[in-house]
Amino acid sequence: KDMVHWELIGHAITDPDELDLSDIRDSHGIWAPDISYSNGRFIIMATLRLNADGKRDNNVMRRQVVVSSDRPEGPYSKPSWLEVDSIDPSHFVDDDGKHYMVISPGINLVPISDDCTRVTGDLIPVWPGTGERCPEGPHILRHGDYYYAILAEGGTGYGHGINVGRSKNLFGPYEASPYNPLMRQLDPNAPIQRTGHGKLIEDANGDWWVYYLMGRPNRGIEVANGKAPKPGEIRVPGAYTTVGRETGLDPVRWLDDGWFVINEGKGPSNEQTAPDLPEVVYPKWQRDDFDSDTLDVHWQFVRRPAPG
């Protein structure tokens, strides 16, 4: 409720018969879930990364999964599978009511049904990005007279970032922002690194924010010749983000020229003033006596335990 404190309330897919990951390799499985709200329903889209390598005909690497519910805590619908072999889906509804799955690489639009359960047309490429490596994590935002195409670029390691382009036509052409990269950590010794894959949100006061992926490495990154690493480059073995990808929040400001900047162009903040919303702090889950027949919702595993 305050955009800072969060409480785990459930899971979108709970039936193993609906999503069997028992044979899926480590680091594969469900990737990059995105949640949106449309027509009174919460819609979650995600990628299922399969074991295939995509190097042979009909060797599908990825499928897209969609579930929905009229309540954020669920229960959610049975999964619908959209056969689009890519990653990082998100949901966009245009002013004319048409629904699209937005998917990488770059910004591509896949026409889908109003309930988001079926592909209804061919994939439409609209913006490849700025030319940096790994254009992914795509979102489309309609604001004022423009469509904004928001991308993660630079790879998901050190040098990860957020770039944006805009167009007055959904299908382009898009021009890149003169303020790119909108988000990137340029200080190799900063405690927050690998910042990218962001999604904008407007709060109840009309203020804008971006949630984004980030990581906190065990130690800093070596600087060569006084320069920070290039996008995707790691110079020090062992500069690992042990707890994995985390979530950052920074303010967004719309400019008079119609573009926006994140955190005044300063990169990710180490500390930030919270949104001006009533604070809601949930009790921390710290103990489990295992006195129930079912595990608490907070227990999570990479895969379900094997039977027996």
Please annotate each region the language model reported.
Residues 1-308:
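Carbohydrate-active catalytic/glycan-binding domains of CAZyme proteins
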